[in-house]
Amino acid sequence: MQDTYQPAQIEAAIQQQWANEERFKAVVNPQKEKFYCLSMFPYPSGKLHMGHVRNYTIGDVISRYQRMLGKNVLQPMGWDAFGMPAENAAMKNQVAPAQWTYQNIAEMKKQLQSLGFAIDWSREITTCRPDYYRWEQWLFTRLYQKGVIYRKLGAVNWDPVDQTVLANEQVIDGRGWRSGAIVEKREIPMYYFRITDYAEELLNDLEQLDGWPERVKMMQRNWIGKSRGMTIRFPIEPESQKGLSAENAQFLQIYTTRPDTIFGVTFLAVAAEHPLALAAAEDNPALRQFMTECKTGSVAEADLATMPKKGMATGRFVTHPLTGKRLPVWVGNYVLSGYGDAAVMGVPAHDERDFHFAHQYGLPIVQVIQTEKDLPAFNADSWQEWYGDKEEMHVIASDDCNGLNYDQAFEKLSEKLAALNLGEPKTQYRLRDWGISRQRYWGCPIPIIHHDDGEALADTLPVVLPEDKIPDGGGSVLAQSPDYYECRFQGKAARRETDTMDTFVESSWYQFRYMSPHYQKGMLDPEEVAYWQDVDQYIGGIEHAILHLLYARFFTKLLRDEGLVHTDEPFKKLLTQGMVLAGTWYREQEHGSKIWFNPADVQVKTDDKGRIIGGVLLSDGKPVQYGGMEKMSKSKNNGVDPQALIKTYGADTARLYTMFTAPPEASLEWSESGVEGAYRFLRRLWAYCYEFRHSIAKPSEVVPLNEKHQNIRREIHEQLRAARFDYERNQFNTVVSAGMKLFNCLNEIEPDYDALRREGVRILLLILSPIVPHITETLWQALDFSGVISDQALPEVDETALKQDNMTLVVQINGKRRGEISVATDAAQQNIIDCALADERFAPYLAGLTVQKTIYVPKKLVNIVAK
């Protein structure tokens, strides 16, 4: 054992030992309880960031702790390797995405391994390899045959210059990110999953997920968006039916969650793609031009919500189903063609969007809801929040519905509209079917062949993606590659589908493929699936709360219905780790933009309380402005390189710092002094163990503990109990605190009590081993403890050590603390009170007073009330 802590040397040696022994290889063992711990797998960008380090350290600590509880732990790792960033990098570097991706994977794997994670690398998966995505294609064929996957027209962002489809994030201010051209909305054939068929189950099963943060469950509830409303049909006037097909000519149908406001409808709005709008535009050039404008811009809902609302009258009219009034139909750029009926009723008095739209175009505003709260009266010139409420409201100006609240009006209107066959109650979901077609190269090929008579499933799987293409940004690479798409079907020329699947598909089922990554007889090995079942603990960022987690839940139900898994939900518990923050520094340019500098390049100035008051750039000595703590990012240039950190301090310091500085769910504010503090603690631990090892030539006699050392042993086991409790709660910062307190206890043990020192060191190393596995494994072996530390059980608390012969109680007189007394732990209440009254130290406070009563709070205090 070296006399100084050399992290690089010991970490390399321990990692090699683990690898040689396949220490963390997971094998099915029906005799042991399983624990499957999974952190969201990374995109292989080529470089780890501190968010990765924190995420995977949390998962590793949980995995190692569960291993100490005697469970058979599976902690795998893989690569979410398809996606647009690889295509962008390929264009920039003129290299095939496959080459770029595989190089990055090799580099990132080394970085992950340098952190000492207890990963079973034999189960590594890479989603861009055919041995993974072939089973995705196989499942596609099954679901396509059953109608769970279908094809229809879907709206996309189209760049008319680059002649390519753009993802929502590639549309910036309505323009293509590369060409700068105004983006158009286009409809093209796409493949969809019928996720809406599972909407109710996805919603209801959230109640089973007791181990998920309530915030995440609420986000999913809102995304699924179950609503109780009503379908209402507005008869189209005869002269407005021109150009409409028979099925579209009779009614304009809408869905609303506020049927109680139906008497306030003053117009209807339809999407530019609605049949009525298309018919009206046939002989209306101005309307046709406006509808063309509506088809420009992003199809992303977030963009649609913030864009200016515009409209144009169609010249067509419908009849109000209850009043018979004539209502104009407008085309509105805010109405979504792919959602509901692509038509909405306009109630300006009680919908903020409709209110501003009506003011913009001079449409009537009719109040039909009155508040029962003490609020300002309705004013058609100024929007107030209560106009849109439905709680503590009643209906007015609505015939025989007057005076009714929302629920009463809903029932009344249901009856009235049903009697006229013009409406009925309906439950609707915000969730829409999942369009998986992507007009991109670097993704899983869709196994479809198009031929003269329609389309068919590919008869040979996998349909292998060529890995030698280099995209140029000018449209789909596969659509420009005859060597890929040209094929034959039943002896005739045919064309292979050139769209690829949404990369969320790969990450929706990877948790199950880890169970049998090399299985060739099917998508999943039944024996492995029966044992591992589901993920016991999942770890990842809150940014994945909706799409990834919802799609993974959906896929689990699909796989269950195919008989491939036997669980309804993929992840029993979910931990969403907080962000890693760091200080930001910048200089503002003349034109208003900012140049950001890395904190490592800044000399920070602080006041006498340690607060930042400024800084200067080390390279030129000139001032830079402090921008506060923000999430580490490339854009703010405030990242910390994990590899540089590991090189300087070691992986255990990085792990200790990230676990100690903040609870897992909270944001972590980066501090160089904090990193140095973690490193100092490990050096002190090493030095203590070195001194201990060399101070004992042979096992010493067990010396009976005096009162001081009984108290030290009690404190050791108190901290062990605290650490065990906090491990169960994933509060690793307080686990480290308990370890540090325990370490302080060790320093109080006198030389003659080596048996107690050895017990304390053993407990300390075991407590810290999930967090700092390299140093604890090394010290464990150096101190000749049996076996290896990663195979040890978590130590049990010795309850006898926690028992105290005496306890200390506070003594109060008339509620004021006057001192303490020491009494036997098992003393009777009256004896305790008598002891307090007899103590001469309290006599001056009772002089001239008569004791009225005494109050005893068990194990805490005695209060003497005297007058």
Swiss-Prot record:
One of its GO terms (biological process) is leucyl-tRNA aminoacylation. ATP binds at residue 634. One of its GO terms (molecular function) is leucine-tRNA ligase activity. SUPFAM superfamilies: Anticodon-binding domain of a subclass of class I aminoacyl-tRNA synthetases, Nucleotidylyl transferase, ValRS/IleRS/LeuRS editing domain. GO terms for cellular component: cytosol. Its main location: cytoplasm. The keyword Lipoprotein does not apply. Pfam families: Anticodon_1, tRNA-synt_1, tRNA-synt_1_2, tRNA-synt_1g. It catalyses: tRNA(Leu) + L-leucine + ATP = L-leucyl-tRNA(Leu) + AMP + diphosphate. The keyword Ubl conjugation does not apply. Keywords: Aminoacyl-tRNA synthetase, ATP-binding, Cytoplasm, Ligase, Nucleotide-binding, Protein biosynthesis. Its EC number is 6.1.1.4. This is Leucine--tRNA ligase. It comes from Dichelobacter nodosus (strain VCS1703A). The gene is leuS.
